[in-house]
């Protein structure tokens, strides 16, 4: 009976250690996934803004507006993630980028080439947010 109790205790300890060992890698993996998602959102937003600038250069204001609208969602996700991580300066820069995108979209709706300047400012704000 004593040997059975020892075996059960050792089995419980082994299962507990196995669980702890498996869970320890999960935190690092989850952080890696979140970092990759952040980079993906930033790259997606940048690509839409750059596409919008090309459309503005080609005087295709309708496509530019669509591209700028598509840039808002990843910018918002990136900003929210930065805020939740406590990166205040980066979140503020990302919020500024979002404001520039909205201004660019508004100008594009008026067929104003100044939208290109606002889109450029949005890219600078994104660069500022990601360089910190």
Where are these regions (language model features)?
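Long, charged/polar, soluble alpha-helical segments
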Residues: 1-132
């Amino acid at each position: 009976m004593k040997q059975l109790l020892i075996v059960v205790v050792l089995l419980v300890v082994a299962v507990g250690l196995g669980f702890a060992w498996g869970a320890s890698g999960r935190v690092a993996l989850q952080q890696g996934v979140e970092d990759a998602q952040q980079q993906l959102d930033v790259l997606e937003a940048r690509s839409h803004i750059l596409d919008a600038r090309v459309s503005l250069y080609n005087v295709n204001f309708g496509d530019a507006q669509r591209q700028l609208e598509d840039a808002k969602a990843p910018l918002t996700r990136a900003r929210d993630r930065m805020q939740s991580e406590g990166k205040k300066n980066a979140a503020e820069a990302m919020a500024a980028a979002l404001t520039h995108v909205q201004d660019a979209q508004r100008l594009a709706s008026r067929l104003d080439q100044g939208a290109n300047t606002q889109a450029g400012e949005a890219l600078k704000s994104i660069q500022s947010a990601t360089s910190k």
